[in-house]
């Protein structure tokens, strides 16, 4: 059963392997429509989460080169000391009238134990983590007590699709269900195949073409 689900995940990932450029374009289009709808910045804020530092650096370069950098873009990642992180978090939590920051680009170093909900109810997962708990931790940065908006908007633009149905090849929700089932198997059985499990993120993101089951 594990092998069958992994084969299906691999198929979705392979169909989306060549869509990295469209994912970046989808992010830029979303930011333009939601944060600069008339060419001017509004008061909305968004958090962009990546799992890997390399992805973090890649999307940072794209954002900066398309008018979404400078004082509007803040970063949180594992390479920052606690002392360096505090003013960044404070700027993002401050009123939009007092702080120009509108986009927070973060790795999972910022996904646990940090409150970011004061003036933000939008979050984008650039990469879907293998462990669903990590995704829940990310969402919990804004989906928590103290959130002032009625809705919290979460987007997974893995294939550069629209915000209503973004996914790997249109299968984002299927992937999440499969991952949760695999995680449940690990809880019930003690583990998922130790050779297959570490390859999951690569399959989902398309960086692996096939599973090595040796």
Could you say what each language-model-derived stretch is?
Residues 114-128, 152-156:
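A short beta-strand element within the Helicase C-terminal
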Residues 131-154:
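Conserved SF2 helicase motif VI
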Residues 1-102:
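Conserved Helicase C-terminal RecA-like lobe
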Residues 62-68, 121-122, 144-147:
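Short, surface-exposed basic-aromatic patches at helix termini and helix-loop junctions that form
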Residues 53-56, 80-82, 109-112, 128-132, ...:
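Conserved nucleotide-binding/hydrolysis micro-motifs of P-loop NTPases
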Residues 104-120, 139-147:
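SF2 helicase motor core recognition
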Residues 149-214:
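C-terminal accessory region of SF2 helicases/translocases
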